[in-house]
Regions:
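Internal, Lys/Arg-enriched amphipathic helical interaction segments that engage polyanionic partners
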Residues: 1-37
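Compositionally biased, intrinsically disordered low-complexity regions enriched in proline and serine
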Residues: 2, 35-38, 58, 144, ...
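Short, charged surface segments at domain edges that flank catalytic/cofactor-binding sites
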Residues: 28-91, 103-113
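A detector for short metal-coordination/catalytic motifs
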Residues: 88-96, 100-168
């Protein structure tokens, strides 16, 4: 796995994640729609496409919306973090983040694009996870909050493995 391919994978998958967040925040979301985890096992899907040698897996907009709705439109790092109100639906702006990055899907038999692996974050925390020097602190917190839910979906990852996906 070359450095260039790793860099390309990060860039291409980041673009997919940005497009997902743009799509979910541009649409009107019904706040009253409550989502419950179902623990149905979902096998890894075929890749959406291969671009520039990078395998890209589809992100399901509805699953991201469900995850954000389940958090009651709050940041899962700190529910007191404030966000602006969206024009589209009057709800707080939140971003969906796959705790185990979709770029790692090839390592897992079951889909990573499930609500149990998608966390709701304010822009500040989402950017800190991707670019902050203390991102490992935030990732560790989310890991401990989500590990049991992930296991129910047969998604097994150690904290050390997860941190390595983020470059720690």
């Amino acid at each position: 796995y070359s450095k260039k391919l790793k860099k390309d994978s990060k860039r291409v998958n980041a673009k997919e994640d940005d497009e997902l967040n743009e799509a979910i925040n541009a649409n009107k979301i019904q706040k009253n729609k409550y989502f419950n985890y179902c623990h149905e096992l979902i096998l890894r899907q075929e890749p959406k496409e291969i671009r520039q040698g990078v395998t890209v897996y589809k992100r399901d907009k509805q699953k991201a919306i469900n995850a954000i709705s389940h958090s009651n439109f709050q940041c899962e790092i700190n529910p007191d973090h404030l966000s602006f109100v969206k024009k589209s639906d009057g709800l707080p702006y939140m971003e969906a983040h796959h705790l185990i990055p979709m770029a790692q899907q090839d390592l897992f038999e079951y889909s990573l694009d499930v609500e149990e692996n998608i966390v709701s974050l304010c822009s500040q925390c989402h950017n800190e996870i991707h670019y902050g020097e203390n991102a490992d602190r935030l990732i560790t917190k989310l890991y401990h909050e989500r590990i049991e839910l992930l296991k129910k979906k047969k998604i097994y990852v150690s904290l050390e493995e997860l941190l390595s996906y983020y470059g720690f």
